[in-house]
Amino acid sequence: MSKPAAAAPSDPSKPSKPLKEVPGSYGLPVLGAVKDRLDFYWFQGDTEFFRIRMEQHKSTVFRVNYSPGPPGYPDSRGIILLDQKSFSVLLDNSKVDKSDTLLGPYIPNLAFTGGYRVLPYLDTSEAKHTAYKDLIFELLHVNSSRIIPEYNKVFAETAGSWEERIAKSGKAEVFASSDSMITKFLLRTIVHKDPAEPGPASLGPKFRDTYQLWTGVNFAGIAHTPLPHFLEELLFHTFRLPPFLVKKQYKALANFYRTHATEVLDLAEKKYGLDREETVHQLILILGINARLGLHKMIPALIYYLGLLGEDFQAKIAAEVRSAVHKNRAQGEEGVNITTQALLEMPLLRSTVLETLRLTPSIFYIYGRAREDMVIESHDAAFQIKKGELLGGHQYFVMRDPEVFEEPHKFVADRFLGERGKAVLPYLVWSNGRETESPSSSNKQCPAKDVAELITMQFVAEMFLRYDSFEITKDSFINTTELNVHLKSLKKRSV
């Protein structure tokens, strides 16, 4: 039986555990950071890097140099939190400052975002954080009727391309194709324009490449690539790449939004008093990084786990999907059979999606700086933290905390069903906030959390309205840095 009560946070002013010094060392200046970076990216890998130190210090809280670090990046010294209890402080905006901590110790050159600090780098105390988050909430509301139909269309296009590739070469890759699908979906839904459609400011058929190149150079400091390690280290992790490398791509993105997102820009300017040009750059990152990468990474992970579970489990999901859709069949637009109500009546599918998010969240790291001196408790100790110290959590470990989750490393599709599921639901964090909490303009939780879950559920529902089952290739794999998944077969729906 799960033990969620063991992870309940206590009053930090009255620690119930023995107070200890935070273990760990940063090593020699610069050299210590370089050693940790080489271990992190090369010699050990990101999960082993933390696992080895957790065992060495016999603690889930310890000091570490975050990567990439000096000499080319700022001071990377911080404290890692690898259990549910200590990690909870990162979700408390009264305790941690999120200014410029999206990537931990550094923020990319602002030239990558038109010279503006965009929403993910803003703390909840900043007025623009509230204004831009309220704008996103309104965009989701006014476009709510477009979400399911637009997703249905892009799914049909993508599924057709998968079928063609399997027929031609025996397999279809999922990562890049789902990225293109999600990018199209977001821009059609929010901007009301297909990025590949010919015309003024079109991004053309290689719109994904434009976004991907800008993303890659922007976040090169934390990149994992297929390059030989010494090249990756030299090119990306030692010094920052200059923004001019993607000036052309970023200009194309900005022109697309200036030209086609006029309704959004009007709303931002007239209702929220936001600068029109700044909003262009906010949209590029909010839609192109936060929303795009968040939604896109869920798809290969879901296909992978559903593929491993096999045909019998897929049949259960298919039956649930088809029953709920039949009961709540949509009226109106031809070909769109799914409704929001139907999705809400698919509990096994929802649990499967949440379990995927537990094991493979879109972002594994959350950071923040202590607003004041405080005491943080883990399951077995308490630690004094100084104001300004950089705190980070790695969700690979937090979402596998054995004090909370039964068989924490195993994919359990029905984990979040029934009373057992209800008990552990508050400890699921994938959206920069707890599953049982709601995003607001005063917190850092993803504003589209609930919509993102429904969209991801819709993806699986679309799969089983079109197919009876599917298989993945034997060499498919996923981990914290790669989602290498290929479809081997798609068995068309028989009834």
From Swiss-Prot:
InterPro entries: Cyt_P450, Cyt_P450_E_grp-IV, Cyt_P450_sf. GO terms for molecular function: heme binding; hydro-lyase activity; iron ion binding; monooxygenase activity; oxidoreductase activity, acting on paired donors, with incorporation or reduction of molecular oxygen. The keyword Lipid metabolism applies. It comes from the Eukaryota. Its EC number is 4.2.1.183. The keyword NADP does not apply. Pathway: Lipid metabolism; oxylipin biosynthesis. Divinyl ether synthase involved in oxylipin biosynthesis. Catalyzes the conversion of (13S)-hydroperoxy-(9Z,11E)-octadecadienoate (13-HPOD) to etheroleate and (13S)-hydroperoxy-(9Z,11E,15Z)-octadecatrienoate (13-HPOT) to etherolenate. Has no activity with the corresponding 9-hydroperoxides (9-HPOD and 9-HPOT). PANTHER family: ALLENE OXIDE SYNTHASE, CHLOROPLASTIC, CYTOCHROME P450 26. This is Divinyl ether synthase CYP74M3.
